[in-house]
C-alpha cells in the first residue's frame, strides 16, 4: 500500500503509475481524485479495462471474513502517518488478527507496532544471514526463496519468528522451501501451492518415493 498526496491509502505495487495506468507520475504526487477513475487493467488484458485502482479500505471490505491478507507498506518518504492509517483501518474492520503487515522498511514495522502492538508484522529481506532474529518490531521474516537456508529457518523459528518465502511459482522450488519448515509462502499460483502442500501433508513415504522414481525416469 502507498499514500496519495491527499493522504488516501491505495493498493498499488509500483511507485510510479505509468506501467499500469499510463500516467507518468509518482503515487505521492497525485491526489485520489486525479487517479480514482484511471484504467488500471488494460495493461494486463483489454477485458480488464474497467478495473480501477482500489483503496485499502475497499479491499478490506471485500476480504473481511474470507481470506487473510499480507499488506506490504511501501513508504515514499512523503507520507503522512501511513502506518497509523493502516493500523486504524485494520482495527475499524476487525482484521488485526487476519492480516500481517510487511515492509522492506523496518521503521514502518516500528510505527505499526507503536500504533497497535497486536498487529503481526514481517520484515522483507533478500538475504537470510546476519543477526536478524532479534529485531523486536518484526514478528517474522519474508525472504526471497532462492536465498533461504534451513539454518536461518531454524534460528528464526527458535526465536519465535514466522518465516514467509517469496516468490515461489514452481513445484520444485515449493517442495524445497516447504521441506525447510517454512510457515508461509507467497506465490502467483495459489492453486498449485495449495494442491502440492495438501498432497505432501496427506501422502505417505512410499507415495513420495514412487513419485521420485517416476520423475527420475522422465
Spans of features found by a protein language model:
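Conserved metal-phosphate-binding beta-hairpin within the catalytic cores
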Residues: 1-3, 71
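A glycine-centered beta-loop-beta connector
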Residues: 4-9, 177
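Metal-dependent phosphodiesterase/phospholipase catalytic core, i.e.
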Residues: 8, 13-120, 143, 157-159, ...
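Short alpha-helical
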Residues: 4-5, 77-81, 107, 148, ...
Amino acid at each position: 500500500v502507498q499514500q496519495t498526496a491527499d493522504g488516501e491509502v491505495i493498493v498499488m505495487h509500483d511507485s510510479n503509475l505509468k506501467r499500469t495506468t499510463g500516467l507518468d507520475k509518482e503515487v505521492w504526487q497525485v491526489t485520489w481524485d486525479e487517479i480514482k477513475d484511471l484504467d488500471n487493467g488494460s495493461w494486463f488484458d483489454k477485458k480488464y479495462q474497467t478495473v480501477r485502482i482500489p483503496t485499502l479500505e475497499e479491499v478490506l471490505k471485500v476480504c473481511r471474513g474470507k481470506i487473510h491478507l499480507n499488506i506490504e507498506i511501501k513508504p515514499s518518504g512523503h507520507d503522512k502517518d501511513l502506518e497509523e492509517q493502516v493500523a486504524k483501518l485494520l482495527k475499524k474492520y476487525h482484521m488485526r488478527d487476519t492480516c500481517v503487515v510487511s515492509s522492506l522498511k523496518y521503521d514502518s514495522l516500528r510505527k505499526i507496532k507503536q500504533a497497535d502492538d497486536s498487529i503481526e508484522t514481517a520484515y522483507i529481506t533478500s538475504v537470510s544471514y546476519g543477526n536478524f532474529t532479534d529485531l523486536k518490531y518484526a514478528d517474522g521474516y519474508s525472504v526471497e526463496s532462492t536465498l533461504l537456508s534451513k539454518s536461518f529457518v531454524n534460528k528464526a523459528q527458535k526465536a519465535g519468528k514466522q518465516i514467509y518465502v517469496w516468490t515461489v511459482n514452481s513445484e520444485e522450488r515449493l517442495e524445497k522451501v516447504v521441506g525447510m519448515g517454512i510457515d508461509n509462502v507467497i506465490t502467483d499460483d495459489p492453486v498449485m501451492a495449495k494442491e502440492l502442500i495438501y498432497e505432501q501433508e496427506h501422502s505417505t513415504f512410499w507415495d513420495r518415493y514412487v513419485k521420485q522414481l517416476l520423475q527420475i525416469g522422465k
